[in-house]
Amino acid sequence: MRVGILTFPGSNCDHDCYHVVKHVMGAEAQYVWHKDRLPEQLDAVVVPGGFSYGDYLRCGALARFSPVIADLVTFAEKGGPVLGICNGFQILCEAGLLPGVLMRNASLKYICKDVTIRVEGQETPVTRGLAGQSLTMPIAHAEGNYFADPETLDRLEGEGRVVFRYVGGAPNGSARDIAGISGGPARNVVGLMPHPDRASESILGLEEGKRMFAALLG
């Protein structure tokens, strides 16, 4: 299993994702610079967190125009597994791979804390065998308030594409307590604001995010 880790100017969680995939899970991982083509031999792609392009204009808005995004869209449309974490979720929304947008937190403050999310909806590449489970992992964002129009929210709910929901209410004001959603032809594109990459080793105090990487790597 070979996983590509996209890297943009301002990414800072690409190393975390690389470490988990390669050193914790024992799979092959390679960085993919935003100006390069997506290697054809990849089995999955992770769009990591960080502050791509310094979050100028809007989170993910500039990264959406990076050359690698066209290849990412093609990869996703062919059913390739794509996981977007935090800023990666924002980028996937800006690129049109997932519906909706991530707005400023309702508190207008940066939030960094552990949260518990519940796995819901239909199975995806990162939630195989995890339905109904609660996972605890950190969030660290200022723009994690998921918003979509009521029709889109109803469609996501009806199609089972609300993949993760905050337990006890969304700390950022996210609509319907949504923490993550899926898209793509086979629910193969998943975006979420919490960081499974920061909850995959005992030394960090949390290992429940490791279950998501185990599902992704099959």
Curated annotation (Swiss-Prot):
Pathway: Purine metabolism; IMP biosynthesis via de novo pathway; 5-amino-1-(5-phospho-D-ribosyl)imidazole from N(2)-formyl-N(1)-(5-phospho-D-ribosyl)glycinamide: step 1/2. The active site is at 86 (nucleophile), 195. Pfam families: GATase_5. The keyword Ubl conjugation does not apply. Residues 2-218 form the Glutamine amidotransferase type-1 domain. Signal peptide: none annotated. Gene3D superfamilies: 3.40.50.880. NCBIfam families: FGAM_synth_I (TIGR01737), PRK03619.1 (NF002957). Part of the FGAM synthase complex composed of 1 PurL, 1 PurQ and 2 PurS subunits. This is Phosphoribosylformylglycinamidine synthase subunit PurQ. The gene is purQ.
